[in-house]
Each structure stands twice: as C-alpha cells, then as structure tokens.
Curated annotation (Swiss-Prot):
One of its GO terms (molecular function) is pimelyl-[acyl-carrier protein] methyl ester esterase activity. It comes from the Bacteria. It catalyses: 6-carboxyhexanoyl-[ACP] methyl ester + H2O = 6-carboxyhexanoyl-[ACP] + methanol + H(+). It comes from Photobacterium profundum (strain SS9). Belongs to the AB hydrolase superfamily. Carboxylesterase BioH family. Its EC number is 3.1.1.85. This is Pimeloyl-[acyl-carrier protein] methyl ester esterase. The gene is bioH. GO terms for biological process: biotin biosynthetic process.
C-alpha cells in the first residue's frame, strides 16, 4: 500500500505547485507542462485517493492541505483548480511563508449556492453523491461533461480530461464521496481577508460550476486579490486556452 502522495517534478526556475480538481489526477496538467517547464520547476501531485495516491485518504480540507505541505517545496507559487483551489487556499492560510503566491482557477471559497451566494445547487451535489454508489465511473463522466459545458471546444476538452482520468489508477470511491462533501460543506469566505500573499483568481465566463459572477462577489471578500476572466472558456481554461492561460500565469509570477 502506498503511504506517500505521488508527486512528480520537472523543469527549472522558481517552484510552481499544481493541484488538480475533483475526480481527476495529476495527468490533467500534461498538455500544459511543455509550456511551463522552461520557466518553472513544476511540481504536480495526485491528491489523496486519486491516481497513484489511490490508497491515501484525507477527510478534511485542512488534512488535504497539510498532506501536500508535508512534501511540497519550502516556498512556491501554488495553483489549484476547482476543488484544488480550495486546498491551495487552505494551504495559503495554514502556511503563508510556504505558499508565496496563490492562484485559484475556476474555484470558489464556497462551491455550494447559499442564499444570494452563487454556486452549484446543493441538490446537484447531493445527486452526484447518490449516483456514486450506483456507478461512480458514470458519475465522473457526467462531471467531466459539466466541466466542459459551454466551452466552444467542449468535445475536445472532455476528451483531454477523460484521457487524464484513464491514464492513471481510477479514483478511490471514498475519496470521491469525501470530495463532494467538501464541495458541499466547506466555506472559507470568512478567512479570505487573512490571505496576504499575491493572489490571482482565474475564471471562465462560460463556467457552469463556478459562475463568473462569483468573481465580482469575490472582489468584495478579497479586495487584496486580482482576477481575470477568460471570455471563451468554461471550467477548465487551462485545457481550452493553454497558451493564454500560461501567459497570464507568467505575467502574475514575474
């Protein structure tokens, strides 16, 4: 049984940590790596319960962040996509001296809609959790389709995301269930003012999971951060617009 998270490292330059989202694994960054490794020493991980970290579990966002901090560079820019953005944000709060810059991609401090807060309807997350017990592979595929919905290149986006999922061991069903619970329950909004590192928030205007209007709400909660919205992207702008995505990242890390 594996007892340590699966990390991979490539490239040279300042350290950059990449954290994937729910249902995925570190292979999701594959097409981005040739654009990043000439400029950064890139570290990407299979999160607890995913890919080659299949046998490792973490029950809370704090535990996930700490597991990553335990084996990550002494200081680095952390980039987290979707659920990975929640983990990166938690790491930035736990260890600001280690997470020197924060980049959140198609992410939110509170994924579930609540009152006037925009997000995923709780019923949708409940349905996904119920479906997991029946056919978790189909549930992951439905989530992939949701992530690409709205993108002009949706079919190609889904193909690339699916290739990443299938290239490594399937996710642990328990980790998938825990991840959906975290997406439904975690709320970091009250702590965002404590983030003092440079922070870039990236969104897709066509995102059906994290509505682009959340960007404006976040301007109020985290005025110390900056943000960019990719006009023709959905939930995975680094898949649909890799060159534009990397250029935005390079401009921020300068």
């Amino acid at each position: 049984m594996t007892t340590a998270l699966c990390w991979q490292t490539e490239g040279q330059g300042s350290d950059l940590v990449l954290i994937h989202g729910w249902g995925m694994n570190g292979a999701v960054w594959q097409q981005l790596l040739p654009l990043l490794t000439p400029f950064y020493r890139v570290h990407w991980v299979d999160m607890p319960g995913y890919g080659h970290s299949h046998d490792i579990s973490a029950d809370s966002i704090e535990e996930m962040a700490q597991l990553l901090l335990d084996k990550s560079p002494i200081s680095a820019t952390w980039l987290g996509w979707s659920l990975g953005g929640l983990v990166a944000t938690q790491a930035a709060l736990l260890a600001p001296e280690r997470v020197t810059r924060l980049v959140t991609v198609a992410s939110s401090p509170r994924f579930a809609a609540e009152g006037t807060w925009r997000g995923i309807q709780p019923q949708v997350l409940d349905d996904f959790r119920r479906q997991l017990g029946d056919d978790f592979q189909l549930t992951v595929e439905r989530f992939l389709a949701l992530q690409a919905m709205g993108s002009p290149t949706a079919r190609q986006d889904i193909k690339l995301l699916k290739q990443a999922v299938l290239s490594r061991p399937q996710p642990n069903p328990e980790a998938l269930s825990i991840g959906l619970r975290l997406l439904a329950d975690v709320d970091l909004r009250a702590q965002l003012g404590d983030i003092t590192q440079p922070w870039l928030r990236l969104y897709g205007r066509l995102d059906g999971l994290v509505p682009a209007k959340v960007a404006k709400d976040m301007d109020q909660l985290a005025p110390q951060s900056c943000r960019q919205i990719f006009a023709a992207a959905s939930h995975a702008p680094f898949i649909s617009h890799p060159e534009e995505f990397v250029q935005t990242l390079k401009d921020f890390i300068k």
